[in-house]
């Protein structure tokens, strides 16, 4: 499916934070996507049609996962290796008002195999980029937005290892070794056909140390600092539970690294004319901006992160700002994907070894949930996996919805609403 075809039935409303795909099949309308941070909509092809011949749809709730507090090392030690050539005076005159970063997405078999049709995978990835763009909506000088220009299915790119299932210790599962997988990606795919490549694995990223412990699965993505338009490592990597929109909460952070932003509290000089302020060396543990080192939010960037990205972009050549793809996936988004996602189904995909799948909210204010199961049918003892992110639009209780990682009063489009008054 090319960008022109996709554009015909994808709809976006940037202000209302919604993304749905509308497709006409056999004289009926099929709708799939995000209605809110918790609600999703999906067709029910096996259900009878209405008297008017319309295809039945289901609106269901979805919840999400989170960064582990130990997720600090998502940039490799060599992240600063190529920056000497960047630390130079550079003019901003060649930088456009809007930087459209072209994105090539590569997905592995554990991820793409969960989609029945190629069109469904393309739609899901396009909606993901739309929601990532919303996190970059308040960037300026330049405004940064991403264009999905190509998708590649790569059956196996992860270095894997078997270990006990964190959520179900009685069984094993396959993990992707984070460091060696990312090194392989840099070696084999580091030169992107676009401005940046996003490698998405359907496996859990982890450090394959022995003895294996739960904390080794804290890393959920990796990137090199300043990777955009780099000839050797224009690559970021994230994990994602297929259909969950979980990587929407991870990609802004990793792409921020690729655009020159270190973790909050750290500084890097890209342009001697635009040095980082001394205040940027201070890191407040209470300000959970997107580039927080251990507990990132997914709502907005700190001013220091924005300044780092501006300084990095000022060092890029004009060729990086030229659009190289002949077509891309522009989208029009109506409702947020969280409006229609079924969290139980997400738990089934994320935790196939579970005996049953129960969704339990956790840290509602940060929009997260757990997938839990009884250890046996004759026991009340339960086990839970790692936290997941609630997608944009999902219900987080008390008539609130999650939008950009915040539980608040929003409608299904992501627009702020007033608190409902009790009778």
Regions found by a protein language model. Give the residues of each.
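N-terminal prosegments of processed precursors
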Residues: 1-46, 115, 168-187, 194, ...
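Divalent metal-coordination and catalytic microenvironments
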Residues: 11, 132, 198, 256, ...
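Short amphipathic alpha-helical interaction elements and helix-loop-helix interfaces
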Residues: 15-17, 28, 37, 50, ...
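Classical protein tyrosine phosphatase
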Residues: 21-45, 123-142, 254-263, 267
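A short, surface-exposed interaction/processing loop segment used at functional sites
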Residues: 30-71, 256
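The catalytic-center signature of Zn2+-dependent metalloproteases
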Residues: 149-170, 231-306, 310-311
């Amino acid at each position: 499916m090319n960008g022109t075809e996709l554009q015909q039935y994808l709809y976006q409303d940037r202000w209302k934070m919604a993304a749905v795909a509308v497709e006409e099949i056999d004289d009926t309308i099929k709708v799939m996507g995000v209605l809110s941070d918790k609600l999703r909509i999906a067709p029910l092809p096996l259900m009878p049609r209405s008297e008017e011949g319309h295809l039945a749809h289901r609106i269901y709730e979805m919840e999400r996962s989170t960064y582990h507090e130990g997720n600090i090392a998502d940039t490799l030690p060599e992240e600063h290796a190529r920056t000497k050539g960047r630390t130079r005076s550079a003019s901003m005159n060649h930088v456009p008002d809007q930087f459209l970063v072209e994105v090539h997405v590569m997905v592995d078999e554990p991820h793409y195999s969960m989609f029945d049709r190629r069109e469904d995978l393309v739609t899901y990835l396009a909606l993901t980029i739309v929601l990532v763009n919303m996190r970059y909506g308040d960037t300026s000088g330049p405004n940064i937005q991403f264009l999905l220009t190509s998708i590649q299915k790569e059956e196996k790119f992860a270095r894997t290892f078997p270990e006990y299932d964190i959520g179900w210790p009685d069984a094993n599962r396959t993990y992707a070794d984070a460091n060696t997988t990312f090194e392989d990606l840099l070696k084999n795919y580091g030169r992107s056909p676009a401005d940046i490549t996003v490698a998405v694995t359907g496996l859990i990223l982890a450090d394959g140390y022995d003895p294996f412990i739960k904390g080794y699965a804290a890393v959920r993505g990796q990137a090199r600092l300043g990777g955009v338009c780099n000839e050797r490592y224009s690559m970021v990597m994230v994990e994602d539970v297929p259909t969950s929109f979980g990587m929407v909460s991870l990609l802004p952070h990793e792409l921020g690294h690729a655009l020159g932003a270190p973790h909050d509290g750290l500084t890097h000089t890209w342009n001697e004319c635009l040095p980082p302020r001394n205040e940027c060396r201070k890191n407040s543990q209470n300000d959970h901006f997107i580039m927080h080192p251990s507990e990132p939010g997914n709502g907005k960037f700190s001013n220091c992160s924005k300044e780092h990205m501006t300084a990095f972009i000022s060092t890029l050549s004009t060729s990086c700002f030229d659009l190289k793809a002949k077509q891309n996936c522009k989208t029009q988004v109506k409702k947020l994907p969280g409006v229609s996602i079924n969290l139980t189904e997400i738990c089934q995909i994320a935790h196939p070894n579970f005996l049953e799948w129960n969704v339990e909210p956790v840290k509602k204010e940060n929009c997260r949930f757990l997938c839990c199961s009884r250890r046996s049918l004759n026991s009340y003892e339960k086990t839970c996996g790692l936290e997941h992110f609630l997608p944009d639009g999902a219900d987080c209780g008390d008539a609130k919805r999650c939008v950009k990682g915040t539980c608040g009063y929003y409608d299904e489009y992501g627009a702020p609403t007033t608190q409902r008054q009790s009778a």
